[in-house]
UniProtKB/Swiss-Prot annotation:
Record's disease association: Ewing sarcoma: A highly malignant, metastatic, primitive small round cell tumor of bone and soft tissue that affects children and adolescents. It belongs to the Ewing sarcoma family of tumors, a group of morphologically heterogeneous neoplasms that share the same cytogenetic features. They are considered neural tumors derived from cells of the neural crest. Ewing sarcoma represents the less differentiated form of the tumors.
Residue numbers bearing the Omega-N-methylarginine modification: 471, 486, 506, 572, 596, 607, 615
PTM annotation: Phosphorylated; calmodulin-binding inhibits phosphorylation of Ser-266. Highly methylated on arginine residues. Methylation is mediated by PRMT1 and, at lower level by PRMT8.
Modified-residue entries (Asymmetric dimethylarginine), positions: 300, 302, 304, 309, 314, 317, 321, 455, 464, 471, 490, 494, 500, 503, 506, 563, 565, 572, 575, 581, 589, 592, 596, 600, 603, 607, 615, 633, 636
Compositionally biased region (Polar residues): 143-172
UniProt region (Disordered), positions on chain: 123-360, 448-525, 547-656
Phosphoprotein as UniProt keyword: yes
Organism: Homo sapiens
Outcome following mutation: residue 651 to A: No effect on nuclear targeting
CDD domains: RRM_EWS
GO biological process: regulation of DNA-templated transcription
Region (31 X approximate tandem repeats): 8-285
Keywords, in A-Z order: Acetylation, Calmodulin-binding, Cell membrane, Chromosomal rearrangement, Cytoplasm, Membrane, Metal-binding, Methylation, Nucleus, Phosphoprotein, Proto-oncogene, Repeat, Repressor, RNA-binding, Transcription, Transcription regulation, Zinc, Zinc-finger
Protein known as: RNA-binding protein EWS
Amino acid sequence: MASTDYSTYSQAAAQQGYSAYTAQPTQGYAQTTQAYGQQSYGTYGQPTDVSYTQAQTTATYGQTAYATSYGQPPTGYTTPTAPQAYSQPVQGYGTGAYDTTTATVTTTQASYAAQSAYGTQPAYPAYGQQPAATAPTRPQDGNKPTETSQPQSSTGGYNQPSLGYGQSNYSYPQVPGSYPMQPVTAPPSYPPTSYSSTQPTSYDQSSYSQQNTYGQPSSYGQQSSYGQQSSYGQQPPTSYPPQTGSYSQAPSQYSQQSSSYGQQSSFRQDHPSSMGVYGQESGGFSGPGENRSMSGPDNRGRGRGGFDRGGMSRGGRGGGRGGMGSAGERGGFNKPGGPMDEGPDLDLGPPVDPDEDSDNSAIYVQGLNDSVTLDDLADFFKQCGVVKMNKRTGQPMIHIYLDKETGKPKGDATVSYEDPPTAKAAVEWFDGKDFQGSKLKVSLARKKPPMNSMRGGLPPREGRGMPPPLRGGPGGPGGPGGPMGRMGGRGGDRGGFPPRGPRGSRGNPSGGGNVQHRAGDWQCPNPGCGNQNFAWRTECNQCKAPKPEGFLPPPFPPPGGDRGRGGPGGMRGGRGGLMDRGGPGGMFRGGRGGDRGGFRGGRGMDRGGFGGGRRGGPGGPPGPLMEQMGGRRGGRGGPGKMDKGEHRQERRDRPY
């Protein structure tokens, strides 16, 4: 029966139109909803279960399972009015007016209303509103469990927003809309109200209706949504990261979700973040980007998986996200990718900004007196957070710029912290503070700081091929997200700050002072010139004197050199780009790999190839998305010079 009902529903109800839907769906839906609610709900009691059930259902959903499950539950669940109400909403939804749905749904009405606003608006702002609306409403809805209700409401709100969002997404793409809806609905609703069943039911329906709408059952939009979920998940990895993956696996995911949901509050938050992320995420799957922020591990999971923020996310990091990670945190990565919660991740902004904002963990300090010492700075600046230590030297990563003639401090320095948030906090905290009698001016270190330091990337490096901003500067921006927005990010991490120590020849100012030398770079033999030229130049860039014989670039760049050159594109990115640290693979990059290779290669080619992983270590597992990228190179990384052509060519057909 269920199956028939379902099919009927799908075809008849869905097709007939939500209007018809109202009537029919009400019944069918009621059942479904009920069933759904029941299932989920029952399961929900055990969040995991619920999620599981739902997930399964979802999986099955496409098939009859849903119907069957639904069918079954219907009887038991028939009672729920929500279904009816929902049916209406559904139809509303079907109608396409989320708003309608909102209005229709009783319990969820308020929420929905908000939602509708959301849906119609798809604006995130609505989002924000939603939560409020939802919360209030939900509480009403869930009179049963007030507490639950509230959480629910929030969740609901969020969920719904998700829905709304989903809607947006929905249009977007695929199921995100429904996806969010469903997850949101089911789990959130359930957890929230014990009775959520109505809501859930409605929610489910909503989702379902979407589905119908969506896939019109057969594909089961939902499922597809779910499938999407993965993408959505990616998108919202934050919130849904697991889901996403899971979603595909529905059950587990769901369970997770449930659990997430179970923790309504957290879910909510998550969700909201997600949402936020979502917005972004969906927008761009930046998700992962901030995703991080979002769900935290969750997000990150995806997020960054979803890029984190996925709501990878976070995109967590969140959030962000989308695309790659989450979808998230990226574009569909980046696409919309608004900034994730974290911003930084997403922060795709101008090439420089991303680095600075999102992954820049160093600050540039001006206004120091000429007797300042490294220890003085370390003691003073550690008030705000942990100053990064140079593992090789055991010294804090603080670089005091010295006057070349007098050898005394010029009054400015860079201080590297363990993470970008700390650096940002330090800027806010120390800017304008008095230090040893002088007023400090503190800002995030730029790739190209005012001083000609050895910082990687500082000078435009002759022409190195890429715009300086992408250059590895202090951390190599990693490039504006490149394909993956987020990726960029950390990029240069390593490369950057001199504080790290003399990075190979590169970091040393010798010679050009502000020009970083790479392995193979040669100095013009003309006594009146002495210009440092890139290894690939055959004549001096200044006086055109021919390159002296025998000056061939060494096969590998000096050990430290080039470390961080983040490549243009986030891809390269120092450390792995996406992940903060390369970590495991960063989204895309082979994690650490990037670190080192960075741009390396290409010696003038900027692109060089993927230096990135090349050099670095194992390359890290390939990022979720980027298989090719990810671990692609890894290993020792070929000659630093990067065989210019080789990899470059190799990567031509797959720019990302």
